[in-house]
Structure formats: structure tokens, C-alpha cells
């Protein structure tokens, strides 16, 4: 349980730090976060979702057969965590895309932040 708590807190801290940077840019004069902030936020989300999936697996395995019964709250959390971690926004292949950017490759528009293709003005901004 101690390992699970430490991994959870570390992943949560990374996500909160990255999302705080996004919020800071958006509450400033930016319509979109910068490329670096976008990339950091995506990396934090991928890491957070996959860490949570591993944590739920750990707890599910610790619970034994009790955890796999349909009435068990762990069973539902296992499905939810696996569903979230395999979603396109958090899937493991994104580590490869983000790693390539960290090694100096040009980011695709998905990771370019405000430097990417224009998406139009945000509501409430002109």
C-alpha cells in the first residue's frame, strides 16, 4: 500500500504541476498553451493514466478473487483505469511521440500548442 500511495502522489503532483502551467498561460493573454506546456501536459496525462492503471492492477491483484467479482468496486475501477489508459489521449504510444520531441524532432500539430494550426478564438476572447 505504501508503494501505491507514493506512486499515486508522484503521478498526481506531475499532473497538477503541468495543468497549473496550462491554466497560468490560459488565464494570461494566451489563446493556447505554448508547445512546451502542451507537451509537458500531455506527458503528465499519459504518465498519470498509466500509473493509475498500474496502481489499480496492484490493488486488484492484492484483493485476489474478491476484486474480480462484478459487485466489487475494484472490478469497476479496474475497467475504468484500463479504459482511460488506453484512450488515444493517454495511450502508451504517446510516450514514443513525446520522446521524439524531447530528442529534438519537430512536433506534430497535436503537440505544437499555440504554434500549431489555428483553431479559432476562444469564446469570450476577440
Where are these regions (language model features)?
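Extended amphipathic alpha-helical segments enriched in small hydrophobics
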Residues: 1-25
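Charged/polar positions within long, soluble alpha-helices
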Residues: 13-16, 20, 53, 57-61, ...
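Glycine-rich phosphate/cofactor-binding loops in nucleotide/flavin-utilizing enzymes
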Residues: 65-126
Amino acid at each position: 500500500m505504501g508503494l501505491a500511495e507514493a506512486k499515486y502522489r508522484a503521478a498526481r503532483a506531475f499532473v497538477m504541476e503541468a495543468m497549473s502551467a496550462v491554466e497560468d498561460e490560459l488565464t494570461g493573454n494566451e489563446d493556447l498553451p505554448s508547445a512546451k506546456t502542451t507537451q509537458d501536459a500531455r506527458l503528465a496525462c499519459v504518465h498519470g493514466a498509466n500509473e493509475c492503471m498500474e496502481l489499480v492492477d496492484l490493488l486488484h491483484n492484492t484483493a485476489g478473487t474478491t476484486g474480480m467479482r462484478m459487485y466489487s468496486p475494484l472490478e469497476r475501477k479496474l475497467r475504468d483505469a484500463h479504459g482511460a489508459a488506453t484512450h488515444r489521449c493517454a495511450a502508451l504510444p504517446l510516450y514514443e511521440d513525446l520522446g521524439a520531441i524531447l530528442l529534438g524532432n519537430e512536433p506534430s500539430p497535436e503537440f505544437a500548442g499555440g504554434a500549431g494550426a489555428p483553431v479559432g478564438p476562444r469564446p469570450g476572447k476577440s
